[in-house]
Amino acid sequence: MATKKKTNFDDITKKYGAERDKALADALALIEKDFGKGSLMRLGEAANQKVSVVSSGSLALDIALGAGGYPKGRIVEIYGPESSGKTTVALHAVAAVQKEGGIAAFIDAENALDPEYAKALGVNIDELLLSQPDYGEQGLQIAEKLITSGAVDLVVIDSVAALVPKAEIDGEIGDSSVGLQARMMSQAMRKLAGHINKTKTTAIFINQLREKVGVMFGSPETTPGGRALKFYASVRLDVRGSTKIEEGSGDNKTQIGKITKIKVVKNKVAPPFKVALVDIMFGEGISSTGELLNIAVEEGIIKKSGAWFAYNDEKIGQGAEKAKNYLKEHQDVFDEIDHKVRAAHGLLDDSEVAETEEETTASKTKAKAKKEEKXVETEEIELELQD
């Protein structure tokens, strides 16, 4: 009886595996040729790439965002009640981008931007690109052209609620315009999302709040413009004013600002639901000294005992306002604490981390040398006493 030849599956796997690998390599080369480098990659290669960000202009918010700022090439939505600080938060991002040498644009659909206030927040108004469109489609088309140019780092649209479709503007008051704005925003998101990702532009959409009628359970709050923006946004921030900041006492109390809570309700680049508490001072914006003081106390870098604040065992003020004034007047101390806070939260780049490690090593070496010197002095004293 003839013996049946045993099939070697390893040889078959190797043969077809080699053919498959060659076919895949050819397909990848063709895709790269037709659509450009990076149009298709292995997930492992993409995972190793660190998310590029632009600073929000607020240390507390950069920490809450997890990645260290707003992600480049993504859409961000900032929403909240009236006068909660939404535009202030966006303008700080504009100032931060300009500080790094970037170009920012502001689509002012509400026609409410105050140049003097923007200047007080650190915005270079001479370099800021500003548009006040007549209708919604025009504003979105201007934003699209700026984004596709690849020359702009940040585009702010203020606000989605004010992007009124042309058909609604041309019509009469009282005409039905159900779904017009939602359709406009849905189409805009489909067009803009790809361009934003390709050019690595950060797009910030400021939005207002509305209330749904007849909601019995859950929050009745919603944002205008349909659902498209909610889906396409990588980051969504809920901005709400909470506590008054006052100075003086009794009848002479004056409100000089407010503590604002910024909640990260959606985040595709880091864990969501983190909260940043910032001091928004009237005429000044987010207080950098205020948020640094709060975070440094949380991290134990600045010690708080009762109403007193101390750094390196030296008292810097009784009460938060005096401690903030001390940090304003002593820039070197502010920079030192800021560096320590950023190091604690991994917000330093590689060169700064290396510099910090060198400083730490030098500090430890110095402390060790001092300890050894003290020990030698002690031994000499003991020998003298014995003699």
From Swiss-Prot:
A Pfam family hit: RecA_C
What PANTHER family does the record tag this protein with?
Answer: MITOCHONDRIAL DNA REPAIR PROTEIN RECA HOMOLOG-RELATED (PTHR45900:SF1), RECA (PTHR45900)
Matches recorded under SUPFAM superfamilies: P-loop containing nucleoside triphosphate hydrolases, RecA protein, C-terminal domain
Q: Where in the cell is it found?
A: Cytoplasm
Q: Which UniProt keywords apply?
A: ATP-binding, Cytoplasm, DNA damage, DNA recombination, DNA repair, DNA-binding, Nucleotide-binding, SOS response
Per the record, GO CC terms?
A: cytosol
Q: Where is this region: Disordered?
A: 348-387
InterPro entries per record = AAA+_ATPase (IPR003593), DNA_recomb/repair_RecA (IPR013765), DNA_recomb/repair_RecA_CS (IPR020584), P-loop_NTPase (IPR027417), RecA-like_C (IPR049261), RecA-like_N (IPR049428), RecA_ATP-bd (IPR020588), RecA_C_sf (IPR023400)
What GO molecular functions are on record for this protein?
Answer: ATP binding; ATP hydrolysis activity; ATP-dependent DNA damage sensor activity; damaged DNA binding; single-stranded DNA binding
Q: Which residues bind ATP?
A: 80-87
Location (main, coarse): cytoplasm
Name listed for the protein in its UniProt record: Protein RecA
Q: Which organism is it from?
A: Lactococcus lactis subsp. cremoris (Streptococcus cremoris)
Q: Name one GO biological process term.
A: DNA recombination
Name the job this protein performs.
Can catalyze the hydrolysis of ATP in the presence of single-stranded DNA, the ATP-dependent uptake of single-stranded DNA by duplex DNA, and the ATP-dependent hybridization of homologous single-stranded DNAs. It interacts with LexA causing its activation and leading to its autocatalytic cleavage.
The superkingdom of the source organism is Bacteria
**Compositional bias annotation for Acidic residues:** 349-360, 378-387
Family, per entry? Belongs to the RecA family.
